[in-house]
Amino acid sequence: MSAGSGLKHEEHNVGDEDVNFLQIWIEPKLQNVMPRYQRRFFPKDKRKNKLQTIVSNEEGQEHCWINQNAKLSLGWFETNNTIEYKLNPLNKGVYVFVMEGALKSGNETIGRRDAIGFWETDTVTFTTEQESEFIIIEAPINH
């Protein structure tokens, strides 16, 4: 979703079952642009042991577009897989959020519903300690 010049937004769970989702807000590159909304379905089996881009600033049919030099990727990896993620030269920050499982980067283990940030690096490497689902959020960082 690109709000353009602003929006009012509410979320309500009208059902009886618990809902788990992430709501991620990224500041736009350009302000006051035409509002835009996209919806895509990302089957889990399409990302087994690989990263699947779900949001990017590049137009495409396989992911949603964003008005920012940002990229969001989902991963679903079996135990003992090593993932090496190379950052876009325009970006200087990556945030990895673990939805299920556990990842290890250096001496740090990141468990379920935990996250870690990386900046001032070109590559991020981590290993799955168990079967894991996670999202990588790459975006410009202003220091």
Please name every model-derived segment.
Residues 1-143:
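Jelly-roll (double-stranded beta-helix
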